[in-house]
């Protein structure tokens, strides 16, 4: 239609725009204001008060965690043609305990915990496991199946254990307000594609982790920083926050 006459299509479009605008406008009513914001419940950790330190530790390094290490270590021993490794769950628990002790009682080598000299020997370690058995488990201990490699994950060798720890952290978390996320460094001086150097940090060399924590320091979730994956995330920074995968 020519001239000043408006087409039916234009009239329909104008009517639609007016209807949309009227829907978006708030409808005000008179009355007293009532606060509708509910109070977030406080976390209840009373069930952990009667637990020992060992019991709490087992909430995270649980039976499933230990059995997975046993199965994968036996699998790797078979891969190396050692059919009689016979690694047990109790041995894996003892092995982990020795690793914890070695973090506090630092010696030039692991063999020194069984040294004949009293100034080197650690009786708690030497009486819990034989030296040769410990070194054998060191050779066989494995966290994942070598036939199932994820080329996109630099942490594939420990990914199953990381996922189990994440599940345990989530299961034992009591929801609360004021969670925060930030970077955390795990000291490491060896060679790995994920090792970082951050100048000005108390721990300059090691693995950088994205962590979600409560105000009291409880670790809710975590993820290892991997540059390739991080670059993919940064390409979407206008749409997603960097540590979106922690939620």
Where are these regions (language model features)?
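N-terminal initiation segments
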Residues: 1-245
């Amino acid at each position: 239609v020519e001239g000043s006459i408006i087409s039916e299509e234009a009239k329909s479009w104008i009517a639609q725009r007016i209807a949309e605008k009227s829907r978006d406008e708030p409808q005000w009513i008179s009355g007293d204001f009532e606060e509708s914001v509910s109070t977030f419940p406080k976390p209840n950790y009373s069930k952990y008060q009667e637990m020992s330190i060992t019991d709490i530790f087992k909430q995270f390094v649980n039976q499933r965690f230990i059995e997975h290490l046993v199965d994968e270590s036996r699998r790797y021993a078979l891969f190396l043609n050692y059919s009689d490794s016979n690694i047990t769950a109790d041995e894996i628990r003892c092995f982990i305990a020795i690793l914890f002790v070695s973090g506090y009682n630092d010696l030039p080598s692991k063999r020194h915990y069984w040294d004949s000299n009293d100034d080197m020997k650690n009786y708690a370690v030497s009486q819990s496991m034989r030296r040769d058995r410990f070194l054998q488990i060191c050779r066989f201990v494995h966290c994942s199946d070598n036939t199932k490699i994820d080329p996109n994950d630099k942490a594939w060798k420990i990914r199953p254990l990381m996922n189990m720890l994440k599940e345990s952290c989530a299961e034992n978390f009591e929801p609360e307000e004021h969670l925060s996320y930030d970077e955390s460094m795990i000291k490491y001086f060896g060679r790995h594609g994920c090792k970082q150097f951050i100048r000005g940090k108390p721990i300059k060399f090691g693995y950088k982790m994205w962590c979600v924590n409560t105000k009291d320091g409880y670790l809710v979730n975590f993820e290892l920083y991997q540059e390739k994956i991080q670059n993919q995330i940064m390409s979407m920074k206008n749409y997603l926050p960097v540590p979106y995968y922690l939620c």
